[in-house]
Amino acid sequence: MRKDAIENRQRIEEIAHKLFDEEGVENISMNRIAKELGIGMGTLYRHFKDKSDLCFYVIQRDLNTFITQFKQIKDDYHSDYEVMKVSLDYLLQFKIDNKTLLHCIEAGNNKLRFYQSAFYQELFDFYYDLFKSDDDIFTKFKTDMLLQSLSTSVFAFQIEHRHISIEAYRNYLLNIYLDEVERND
């Protein structure tokens, strides 16, 4: 990519991030972003195929910081229960803090992009390692099911419609995904 194209893309991401923070993701259209930047819609869509795609790239900086701190949890805590509990607390707080961006990403047309992203792979590897057993297929399945339980839409539904507290949500996940021996470590 040419230097000016890279700079344009960064400018788009910065202005979008600013507008999303100030007015909310749902209140900002791609047209509004283009007007704010003084660029044509073609230029905007050359860099980002839709709003979901733009949201995905806007959140990348936060994801990189998140992953660095997330990995530190395994060094700071020793039992599987502690690691899982603290990591879930951290992940759920991240979801709350970035709810509208994450909703926009998940609502997009390219759902596979998230599952193929470095962020998803980092989460997968983290929990796969925690659940590791002799049955690799089961461990992968269990890890994927946990991550599906942590999708923004499932989490929001449980909190907003089932009226489950965040702490209860975390505790239910601990009960489902860690067996009794691990919970009592």
Curated annotation (Swiss-Prot):
SUPFAM superfamilies: Homeodomain-like. Residues 29-48 bind DNA. It holds the Pfam family TetR_N. Residues 6-66 form the HTH tetR-type domain. This is HTH-type transcriptional regulator SAB2452. Keywords: DNA-binding, Transcription, Transcription regulation. InterPro entries: DNA-bd_HTH_TetR-type_CS, Homeodomain-like_sf, HTH-type_Tx_Regulator, HTH_TetR. GO terms for molecular function: DNA binding. It comes from the Bacteria.
